[in-house]
C-alpha cells in the first residue's frame, strides 16, 4: 500500500466515514466483545489517538442533532467498552516485528487463560446476517470445546497463493462449520488442498500460546500463526472453520485496487450520501463510455 501508508497506518485509512480499524472495532462490539486489546508498534500511535476520549473535542464542536448522535457513538466508555494497548516488540538486530504468531503471543497475559478473539485490523467483514460471523464463531468454539476456530471463505483457485488455505476433514468439505485436518500457508494453485482461505478472524483457547512457543521461525525469521494452528491440529486439538455466508463479504485492504473497491462499496452504502454517489458514478461511467481518455465532469 505504499506510498499511501508511508506516514499513515493502513488500519487508519478511511473507508466510508470511518477508518478501517473503526469498522473492525464495531464488528467486535456487535458480537458482545467489550475488552479490546490492540497489539501495535511505534508507527501506529494514530490508532490509539483515534480511540482516545472525545470529551474535550465535543466541548469545542457545534453540532446539530444528527451530528451529535453520530459523534456520541465514539463515547465507548458509556457503551461499556474498554481499550487496552500493547506493542509488539522488534528484537535487537531485526528491522520488523516477528510476524502474526508473535503478535498473538503478546496478548497472553491479557487473555488470562480464557478463550479470545483475534481480528486483523486491516480486514473488514461486512455482514447482513442476523447472527454475525464472529458470534457464530464464538458459539461454535464453545460448543465444540475447540482450541481454535477460523473464519474462512472460498477464493478462486488462482488466488490460493495469497492466503492460508484450510483442509477440512473428508466428511465435512461442504459444511458451513467443519473440523479441520490441516492448514497450509499460501500454497500454489496446484498444491492447494481446497479453496477455503483464512479470513482474518480467529478464536483461540489458551492452547495457542504453547503452540506458538513450540514452532520454529520461518526462513524469513517470522513466527506464522498458520504454523501454530497446524501444530494444534497435529497435537490432536480440535480446530474448526466457520464459513462466511453468501450475505457476508471480506474486505481485504491489501492493495490499492481492493482499497478503492471497498471504499466505493461503503460510499454507495452510506445512508445519507449513497444515492448521490451512485448518481455521480453513473455520470462518470456514461461520460467514459462516450469520451474515452477525457477527464470526468
Model-derived features: positions:
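Short N-terminal binding/cap micro-motifs at the start of the first secondary-structure element
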Residues: 1-3, 46
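Short alpha-helical oligomerization interface
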Residues: 6-10
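Conserved N-terminal catalytic core of the sugar/cofactor nucleotidyltransferase
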Residues: 14, 18-120, 125-129, 139, ...
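Terminal amphipathic alpha-helical/low-complexity segments used for targeting or macromolecular assembly
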Residues: 25-34, 43, 52, 175, ...
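Structural beta-sheet core signal
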Residues: 38, 118, 148-151, 241
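A short acidic, often aromatic-flanked loop/helix-cap motif at beta-alpha or helix-coil junctions
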Residues: 90-98, 157-158, 189-191, 248-251
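Conserved core of the sugar-phosphate nucleotidyltransferase
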Residues: 124-211, 215, 219
